[in-house]
């Protein structure tokens, strides 16, 4: 018997249920550079102290179970357990607390977002002692980051591939999202790209349905891309959605896209799953394909303020798993997104190093070391009048995506694309000349519309369209 085993055996085993806080609440713990740190918004059940609730989260998401077990004596719990090391009340909320938990790195498989989430946001979210639980943020240590490939290419490589610099990229989701034949779909793609857009996009639920099988769509879209490139002299792309029912089918679609020579494919990373997404990201890097990521299903997870997981965590997970673009909200359009919160996770997607900033919802300083950045995509209910605000909010390293705001133009798809391109170029020029886009935006668009009948028509159509609802998820 080894000395270590003798020591553990001599302690003895006492069956029964213990308070979690006796083992997992460690306020004196000093976090390590290699720890994964998590900030949970905890709402305990009545009568459950916050220390016990925070310790329960640490236990149930690491080594703990509901009772003492004799096999605890066969390992070093002190080495492997999660620790709740700090608890603070949430300002303005009754019986809500932020519980900070540190996890030792050895709890997680290298290069696996799937395994990381299975532990941290697994069974613990159904724990009866908690009325609600939300993961607000994660600090991923550099030692763990270095086990991931991350985005297939990143922002700079994408710009070099496209030969487009100094402005946001322009996109459009083809509408109606379902029901078009492959040929009519390809026609809409061609008209939008010819009109001046950089990208067009499959909607998230376009996969391979009876009205339009994936192979037919890929072929007609490739034809549209090459025709538009020949006529405009610009590199164009269409986000061909490779999402499928199996990983094998997904990769088959990506292989066909590569054989067609198109620059980019797409994946629904939450409905498709992180294992599938990471596999596709590896294929895309190895084969020179950019990867656009749609976040369909995110609001099921992140929209409620007291339960689920904040999108900033999903954004960090996507950067680890791999994607060159990801939808991030618009601040000004029809979909959820408060400005400071949105800009907080936009920086987490793009920048190499992000300081802790609670005013933007960032709970931890995050160093991404050499992991490439991800372009945020603003999409959903936006049109030409939003262009100055979008340019000012998101800056050059972004994709501005107008679906209805392109295809809803009264003169057709190509004029809709022209209107958006003229509006963007006018905003970029005005910004470069030192004008204030936030204050002078409408005037800049009106001036540009004098020289572009397409833009003037778009301005008239959408002059009264607004989406003025308060965001559900706001800063505390």
UniProtKB/Swiss-Prot annotation:
Q: InterPro entries attached here? A: RuBisCO, RuBisCo_large_chain_AS, RuBisCO_lsu_C, RuBisCO_lsu_C_sf, RuBisCO_lsu_fd_N, RuBisCO_lsu_N_sf, RuBisCO_lsuI
Query: Which Pfam families does this chain map to?
Result: RuBisCO_large (PF00016), RuBisCO_large_N (PF02788)
The record's keywords, sorted A to Z, are: Acetylation, Calvin cycle, Carbon dioxide fixation, Chloroplast, Disulfide bond, Lyase, Magnesium, Metal-binding, Methylation, Monooxygenase, Oxidoreductase, Photorespiration, Photosynthesis, Plastid
Q: Where in the cell is it found?
A: Plastid, Chloroplast
PTM-bearing positions, type N6-carboxylysine: 201
Return one GO MF term.
monooxygenase activity
Q: Which is a GO BP term held by this UniProt record?
A: photorespiration
Q: Which residues carry this modification: N-acetylproline?
A: 3
Which positions are annotated as binding Mg(2+)? 201, 203-204
GO CC, sorted alphabetically, is: chloroplast
Positions of substrate binding: 123, 173, 177, 295, 327, 379
> Quaternary arrangement and interactors, per the entry?
Heterohexadecamer of 8 large chains and 8 small chains; disulfide-linked. The disulfide link is formed within the large subunit homodimers.
Further remarks about this protein from its record: The basic functional RuBisCO is composed of a large chain homodimer in a 'head-to-tail' conformation. In form I RuBisCO this homodimer is arranged in a barrel-like tetramer with the small subunits forming a tetrameric 'cap' on each end of the 'barrel'.
Q: Which family does it belong to?
A: Belongs to the RuBisCO large chain family. Type I subfamily.
Report what the protein is called. Answer: Ribulose bisphosphate carboxylase large chain
> Which species does this protein come from?
Phaseolus vulgaris
What gene, per UniProt, encodes this protein? rbcL
